From Swiss-Prot:
NCBIfam families per the UniProt record, alphabetical: PRK04778.1-1 (NF003407), PRK04778.1-4 (NF003410)
Record localization: Cell membrane
Record's protein name: Septation ring formation regulator EzrA
One term under GO cellular component: septin ring
Topological domain ranges for the Cytoplasmic compartment: 27-574
Disulphide bond pairs: none
Membrane topology: Single-pass membrane protein
Protein species of origin: Streptococcus pyogenes serotype M49 (strain NZ131)
Topological domain ranges for the Extracellular compartment: 1-7
Family statement drawn from the similarity comment of this UniProt entry: Belongs to the EzrA family.
GO terms under biological process: division septum assembly; septin ring assembly
Chief location category: membrane
Keyword Aminoacyl-tRNA synthetase included in the entry's annotation: no
């Protein structure tokens, strides 16, 4: 055999071996792919879709939800019955083709199975997602329905437990509860018939009505308690108190109290009847008006009770106080009469005492008997309180006025005595001033001093004349005494001033001799001042003239003389 043939055979054998090896490799690779596809199929088949379907089925879906569930359930059945069986057949076919080294057809089958698995995966994901949505939606709807039903049941239980607290509103509350129950039944019917939108609206209304009725029932007991318990109790208390007060001889300015009791009871009954409409705002407002009317009756009774305490106290005090003030007035009249015999008094005191007597007489006539027979009166104590307080106030004013009049007349005799004493003193002082001036040996007395002296003397004479009358005008005495006091004080000051001016002028005239010979101004002022001093007796002008001239030549000289004089000045010895 030639070497060429051998080489050909070897080449063919090698090709066969290589082809076999390639086939084995491709077969193993396909086996691996087929195994992977089988595992994917098993994994998909093992998903808990059936459990999820059963879980959703147990929710007892209705309406559109139930229709949707059936569609997805049928899709799952189709997958398990048809798609998985078809995939299984293709896998089996791919295995046979791969085992017979029909790799091209095997590859085609593998690709087909892979595509089918991809579609199945998507379908299963859609099914599971839809089931989950149905489950969540149903749970949400169920929770909403459960919440609404819980509200209703709690409201029903609350109403049942507190039925006695709702009074006349109970029939209307029962009616509202039945309406809500009807709405729940309507919701179930609509939901079952596949109309979830309208069913949801009905459920919303049922829940809103439940909440609203719950809020109303929370407020009703307080209103009913007022109408059925508080107001009747207060009225009973008022009527009992009213009868007791009448037995204790109380009287009232209001004559319609019994009618007001009846009107309030009618208002309570009317409000209870109107409450069945559940118009709570109106009921509360009417309750407020009823309470205000009850409170006004309490105020009437409390006012009279408080007035009794004050009036009873004042009824005991008034007669004693009246007697005291009347006694004071008699004493004051006697004192004024006694003083009038010696003094001319102001008419004001007499008129005032007469006015006091009139006020006292009016209280004696109008109020004294009422106070003394206080327990037998048939007037409201509040009116008696006002009457007594007005009378006591009048007596207080009278007593205060009496004290003022007494203060005005009690010092009349002292005023006279003091005026006589002052007159004696002032007359003595006038004589001492005259002697004091005479001892000065002045060239003459200034006219202003003479005028003041004789005026003061006249005023003392006027006071003396007034004190010498048979009936003394005490007001005139007081006035003249004050005038005399001022006049004598002014005269004393003027006396000191005249003497000081005269003395200082003499001293300065003598001192000016130092300058007269060589100071023409001093000489001229000396001559002028001397004429004023000796001829005109104007000591103030003379002092001003000479002191001015000396100050021009010797500043401070005047002050030196003035200071020296003030230290040695002789005082009038009274």
């Amino acid at each position: 055999m030639s070497s060429g043939i051998i080489l050909l055979i070897v080449a063919i054998v090698l090709l066969v071996i290589i082809a076999y090896l390639v086939g084995v490799i491709i077969r193993k690779r396909n086996d691996s792919l087929i195994t992977s596809l089988e595992e994917r199929k098993q994994a998909l088949f093992a998903l808990p879709v059936n459990d999820e379907i059963e879980e959703v089925k147990s929710l007892h879906l209705i309406g559109q939800s139930q229709t949707s569930f059936r569609e997805w359930n049928q899709k799952w059945v189709d997958l398990t019955v048809n798609s998985f069986a078809d995939i299984e057949n293709h896998i089996f076919e791919a295995e046979n083709l791969n085992d017979t080294f029909n790799f091209i057809r095997a590859k085609h089958e593998i690709n087909s199975v892979e595509s089918q698995l991809n579609l199945v995966e998507e379908d299963i994901a859609s099914i599971r997602e839809a089931l989950n949505i149905l489950k969540e939606q149903e749970e949400k709807n169920s929770a909403r329905v459960t919440h609404a039903l819980d509200l209703y049941e709690k409201l029903q239980a609350s109403i049942s437990e507190n039925e006695d607290n709702f009074g006349s509103t109970m029939p209307e509350i029962d009616k509202q509860m039945k309406n809500i129950e009807t709405e729940f039944s309507q919701f179930v019917a609509l939901n079952s018939s596949g109309d979830p939108v309208e069913a949801s609206e009905v459920l919303d209304r049922a829940e809103e009505h439940t909440i609203a009725l719950g809020q109303i029932t929370e407020q009703i007991p307080a209103i009913v308690a007022k109408l059925e318990d508080d107001f009747p109790d207060q009225l009973d208390d008022l009527e009992t108190g009213y009868r007791r007060l009448l037995e204790e001889n109380y009287h009232f300015p209001e004559k319609n109290i019994e009618a007001r009791f009846q009107e309030i009871r009618e208002s309570i009954r009317a409000n209870s009847s109107e409450l069945v409409t559940l118009d709570l705002d109106r009921a509360r407002e009417e309750n407020t008006h009823i309470q205000e009317r009850i409170d006004s009756l309490y105020e009437v009774f409390e006012r009279e009770i408080a007035a009794y305490k004050v009036a009873a106290k004042n009824s005991k005090m008034l007669p004693r106080y009246l007697a005291h003030v009347k006694r004071n007035n008699e004493q004051l009249k006697d004192e004024i009469a006694r003083l009038s015999r010696k003094y001319i008094l102001s008419e004001t005191e007499s008129l005032t005492v007469k006015a006091f007597e009139k006020d006292i007489k009016e209280i004696e006539d109008s109020t004294l008997a009422v106070a003394e027979q206080f327990g037998l009166q048939e007037k409201p104590f509040s009116e008696l309180q006002v009457t007594f307080e007005r009378s006591i106030k009048t007596l207080t004013n009278v007593e205060s006025g009496q004290m003022d009049v007494f203060a005005a007349v009690k010092d009349i005799e002292k005023i006279e005595s003091q005026a006589r004493h002052n007159l004696d003193v002032y007359v003595t002082q006038l004589h001492m001033i005259k002697r004091y001036m005479e001892k000065r040996h002045l060239p003459g007395i200034p006219q202003d001093f003479l005028s003041a002296f004789f005026t003061t003397s006249s005023q003392l004479e006027a006071l003396m004349d007034e004190l010498s009358r048979g009936r003394i005008n005490i007001e005139a005495v007081s006035r003249l005494s004050e005038v005399a006091t001022v006049a004598i004080a002014n005269l004393e000051d003027l006396t000191y001033q005249v003497v000081q001016n005269a003395t200082l002028t003499e001293q300065l005239l003598q001192y000016s001799n130092r300058y007269r010979s060589f100071e023409a101004g001093v000489q001229s002022s000396f001559e002028h001042a001397l004429r004023l001093f000796e001829v005109e007796n104007d000591y103030q002008a003379s002092f001003d003239e000479i002191s001015y001239a000396l100050e021009t030549v010797e500043p401070g000289v005047t002050d030196r003389f003035v200071n020296s004089y003030e230290k040695t000045r002789e005082h009038i010895r009274f």
